[in-house]
Amino acid sequence: MRILSIFAAFLASTLIASAQTCLFHTGDSTGYPYRIPAIAKAKNGQLIALSDLRPCGGDIGYGRVDILSRVSADNGASWSEAVPVLQGSGKGADAGYGDACLVADRDRNELLLVCVSGDVPYWQSSP
């Protein structure tokens, strides 16, 4: 009986895993890497997913980094196309935006996005 239970659990997890969706895939048509995903559920039930898109190919401070979002109104069964939330210029204080954290305040019906911005890599920054 124990083996049957283990097999049933394995089968269920396999079925769940096959229903997963990759929202941001490095190697897609952009040719750029995606990193640092974030997700939150808004008061209206929508799921909002964010990720860095890194045209510069590296970390914040090495060039342009954007934050993209995708939204699901059906609890993740389908998703919108990716749209930019913040777009880096590649130089200066707005060179890149990344390492996003997303918080949904359901009482106030607001979203808070916190991220890093700039043109200096972390290891070269000063306090």
Go through each PLM region and give its residues.
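Bacterial N-terminal signal peptides
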Residues: 5-14
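Asp-box/BNR beta-propeller blade signature and adjacent active/binding-site loops
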Residues: 18-127
